[in-house]
Amino acid sequence: MADRIHWTVGLAQTLFDKPLLELLFEAQTVHRQHFDPRQVQVSTLLSIKTGACPEDCKYCPQSSRYKTGLESERLMQVEQVLESARKAKANGSTRFCMGAAWKNPHERDMPYLQQMVQGVKAMGMETCMTLGTLDGTQAERLADAGLDYYNHNLDTSPEFYGNIITTRSYQERLDTLGKVRGAGIKVCSGGIVGLGETVRDRAGLLVQLANLPTPPESVPINMLVKVKGTPLADNEDVDPFDFIRTIAVARIMMPASYVRLSAGREQMNEQTQAMCFMAGANSIFYGCKLLTTPNPEEDKDLQLFRKLGLNPQQTETEHGDNQQQQALAAQLMQADTAEFYNAAL
């Protein structure tokens, strides 16, 4: 195996500065060395506890500090979550992600969270959670329940971070990633484009991720979804080519990681999404309401997959069950996303 590159902001900036077509060619070349370029990993994300978050993340409609019209909801019952997971599997998802608007989970919540993980795993799906800061014991308990992935985004560069969030330090985020990794859970961590950051900040974010002791297995790259009532509601739109560049640089810097198109995909036309796949994106959230922002409808995703000749990735599970992939490919069912919260409605 080749020696791992220790990335600097300068090196990452050099990639961002490349002519776009050269950058895309390099990213696609790297992508093909590590992945089947036609395969796309498909996940569904459910908000299991919505709103009333004490954090002050300026982009987030779930913060209790902003008036966005979002109605807070308590932690969902375990069976409600499992029913949503069944629908997600039937409609093609191979990974089920559960998100809660907390600074950190409380002890009283842990037994329910463990039951959710165990129940989804029993269906033969991969599991992911995003619950805020974890301590070592909580990470171990989730690992023992069978949690495959834990999402905890760094959001932006260390230098720009304080302009966006003041209630949780950058180091706290890094510490949580370390505890998750130490418990044997795979790491999902990325950031957001469009917060008002510079290209150097985007480079700095990717450097932080790529230089972790083990890079994240999954790197979600979000485009800011501007929600009325949040401090960033009037931010300038992200140039699609700038977003595509970020995807490409992420692919080159973290060649073995899944690079996921996450929030903001509903704002992208088919051509932008196609160029993101060309740049090395190989994971999406499909057929869901992405926490408190909308996501494209399932049939649009399927149509785009067909146009581009892409296939949803088969995931080998403990039951060897790839029935969900077949259902997605054949579009046998129409999704029912009533359980997935959408603050845009």
From Swiss-Prot:
Cofactor note text: Binds 1 [4Fe-4S] cluster. The cluster is coordinated with 3 cysteines and an exchangeable S-adenosyl-L-methionine.
Radical SAM core domain sequence ranges: 38-256
A GO biological-process term = biotin biosynthetic process
State if Metal-binding is listed as a keyword: yes
Which is one Pfam family of this protein? Radical_SAM
Sites where the protein binds [4Fe-4S] cluster: 53, 57, 60
Q: Give the residues the record marks as binding [2Fe-2S] cluster.
A: 97, 128, 188, 260
The EC class name is transferase
The EC number(s) attached to this protein equal: 2.8.1.6
CDD domains in alphabetical order: Radical_SAM (cd01335)
* Recorded metabolic or biological pathway in which this protein acts: Cofactor biosynthesis; biotin biosynthesis; biotin from 7,8-diaminononanoate: step 2/2
Q: Which GO terms describe its molecular function?
A: 2 iron, 2 sulfur cluster binding; 4 iron, 4 sulfur cluster binding; biotin synthase activity; iron ion binding
Which branch of life, at top level? Bacteria
Family matches, as SUPFAM superfamilies? Radical SAM enzymes (SSF102114)
Which keywords has UniProt assigned to this entry? 2Fe-2S, 4Fe-4S, Biotin biosynthesis, Iron, Iron-sulfur, Metal-binding, S-adenosyl-L-methionine, Transferase
Q: Which InterPro entries match?
A: Aldolase_TIM, BATS_dom, Biotin_synth/BioAB, Biotin_synthase, Elp3/MiaA/NifB-like_rSAM, rSAM
Catalytic reaction annotation: (4R,5S)-dethiobiotin + (sulfur carrier)-SH + 2 reduced [2Fe-2S]-[ferredoxin] + 2 S-adenosyl-L-methionine = (sulfur carrier)-H + biotin + 2 5'-deoxyadenosine + 2 L-methionine + 2 oxidized [2Fe-2S]-[ferredoxin]
How this chain assembles, per its entry, is: Homodimer.
PANTHER family (UniProt xref): BIOTIN SYNTHASE, BIOTIN SYNTHASE, MITOCHONDRIAL
**What's this protein's function?**
Catalyzes the conversion of dethiobiotin (DTB) to biotin by the insertion of a sulfur atom into dethiobiotin via a radical-based mechanism.
Q: Which family does it belong to?
A: Belongs to the radical SAM superfamily. Biotin synthase family.
HAMAP family annotated for this entry?
BioB
Question: What is the protein name given in its UniProt record?
Answer: Biotin synthase
